[in-house]
Amino acid sequence: HRLNRRQRQMCIRDSNKTVSVGTLALADGSNGGLAANYTLSGGTHQLTVNQRPLNATLARQYDGTTTAAGSDLSSFDALQGGETLTMTGSGTAASANVANGIAMSSNGTLALADGTGLASNYSLNSTVINIAQRVLNSSGSKTYDANTDALAGAITLSNLVSGEALNHSGTATIGSANAGSYTITNLSGISIACL
């Protein structure tokens, strides 16, 4: 015999709590199942709330390593009710180079941590990292020559990853031809390439 349940709402206020039957009701079903032959009163009623799986996205600038730190958390895809979580630990990305959606070759010690929500209500399903281009700084000097050109040979690049080097060529521009200190502009005229 089979009975139908009328679709009425039960409320669960927290995890590991007794579930109140509330307005849940039985209805006649198939194979001779009559609701009048059964009652919910006095029975045992249990509902398991499973952890919700989350996919995490980390994001940082290129640093020449495959380290993926929980502190680089950018977003989760399925948090509920406006909750927030954080991440701890670190894993290993499959590549050190600039790209989006790089998978982990190892999750290492990456773990969810409480925010406004409880980490115990969620499980970490997958983690990817977006690695963005590293921002370089430039500086230099030249002798007065009555023009605003800043040739690549007069410009030094900084904020490179330790041990890495680049070639650069082309011409940028400064704000004035006169002696003084100026912001380098028109950096699109400078190109960089591997040594």
Where are these regions (language model features)?
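Short loop/turn motifs that initiate or flank beta-strands
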Residues: R6-Q9, R13-L195
